[in-house]
């Protein structure tokens, strides 16, 4: 929808509930299985039933190629797998917006493509994504709009062709 998040009358909690966030560190709970990591917020914050949350989580784990890892623990996964689990967790409640903050920066270079492919698939499926990244070739290929920052100030803003081809 069209929600002005700067409007003082806007319900900030409702806005936050419609946003999924993934950080550069995976932030998975080490003592919880993949399935529990993915379902925790849906059950505790959004008050979903365990059955509903687990059904949705298994759909997402299937989508990201991790269904067979549902009972695994984070230390049994590669960095790329952990990041995909973090993305699945962010997608649990079908957010309207997905914020991705340098999600490849903590990964082994061999795993970066795996995560970027997943982001490209999410975009192709219609997910709105705001992504902070240094992966400029990926941004050029996948973005509808690029905003370049220099020292915290917007230096360029436009389509990939406008920004990257200059």
Placement of each model-derived feature along the sequence:
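ABC family nucleotide-binding domain
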Residues: 1-143, 148
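ABC ATPase "signature
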Residues: 157-158
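Short acidic-hydrophobic catalytic motif
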Residues: 161-164
């Amino acid at each position: 929808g069209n929600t002005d998040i700067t409007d003082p009358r806007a319900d900030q909690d409702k806005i936050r509930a419609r946003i999924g966030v993934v950080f550069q560190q995976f932030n998975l709970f080490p003592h919880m299985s993949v399935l529990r990591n993915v379902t925790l917020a849906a059950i505790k914050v959004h008050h979903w039933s365990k059955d509903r949350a687990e059904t949705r989580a298994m759909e997402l784990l299937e989508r990201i190629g991790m269904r067979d890892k549902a009972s695994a623990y984070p230390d049994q996964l590669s960095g790329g797998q952990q990041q995909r689990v973090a993305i699945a967790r962010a997608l649990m409640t079908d957010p309207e917006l997905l914020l991705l903050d340098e999600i490849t920066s903590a990964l082994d270079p061999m795993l970066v493509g795996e995560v970027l492919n997943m982001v490209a698939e999410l975009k192709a499926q219609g997910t709105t994504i705001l992504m902070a990244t240094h992966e400029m070739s990926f941004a050029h290929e996948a973005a509808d709009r690029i905003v370049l920052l220099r020292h915290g100030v917007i230096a360029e803003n436009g389509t990939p062709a406008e920004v990257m081809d200059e």
